[in-house]
Structures are given as C-alpha cells and as structure tokens.
A protein has these predicted regions:
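A beta-strand edge to alpha-helix "cap/lid" segment located at domain peripheries
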Residues: 1-25, 33-122
C-alpha cells in the first residue's frame, strides 16, 4: 500500500463536495481520460465540464475495499466508490466499482485515467 497515492483520493473527493473545481483540475493529469458507468469517454476538459455543469452535485464521496498497486511512477487504485449526491434536487446514494490510474509527475500523484462500473450490492 502506498500512502502517497491513497492520500491523493481524499482531496479530490472533498473538492467535489465543495465544488472546488480548481482543486479537482489541479489533480488531473494533462492527458486525463475517464469512462463513466454508461461507457461514455470524457477527456480532461469534458470531464471538468461535466463536473461543473452536469446534473450531479456531490455531498460526499468515499471509497471502500481500496487496493493500491504501485509500479514505479504509476499506481492503480481499485475499490468501491460511494457517492452521496443530489441529482435534479433529489438526494441519492450511488456506488460503483472503480479503477483509478495515477502517474507521479514531478513528485506529485496526478489522476491519469479512471473508469466506473455499476454494481449491485444486494
């Protein structure tokens, strides 16, 4: 387990809840790409546009069953993300399997790629 890359998750999650888009943007790698649970691929600017202007507003985000695998300046986090959000005025709790890839750039972990998949928790 790598405390450095694990610690990179929390500030982004907190920034989502605070709608602090500058913090989110600063954590994204310049070549960031994200595939959502609907299979839609968003590059860095499209992802930021979705966060700023999309229908979701985060109240809180957490991750459970986190596993971190590091290889040099690359690290992969897998786990289950729990999103407490507001969608069109309605409070919702969503959960997804997630894979997040980070690259260490000048000593700082940057979020390079992510994918979420819908899952049934029973």
């Amino acid at each position: 387990m790598t405390a450095g890359v694990e610690a990179a998750f929390r500030p982004r999650a907190d920034a989502l809840a605070a709608q602090d888009w500058a913090v989110v943007e600063a954590q994204l790698h310049e070549h960031f790409v994200y595939t959502n649970s609907h299979g839609e691929r968003l590059m860095r600017e499209g992802y930021l546009d979705f966060l700023r202007d999309g229908p979701l507003r985060w109240r809180h985000q957490s991750i459970e069953d986190m596993l971190v695998v590091e290889a040099g300046d690359t690290a992969v986090i897998t786990g289950i993300v729990f999103d407490h959000v507001v969608i069109d005025g309605e409070e919702r709790e969503l959960h997804f399997a997630t894979t997040q890839t980070y690259a260490r750039v000048d000593g700082t972990w940057r979020y390079l790629a992510g994918q979420t998949s819908a899952m049934d928790l029973g």
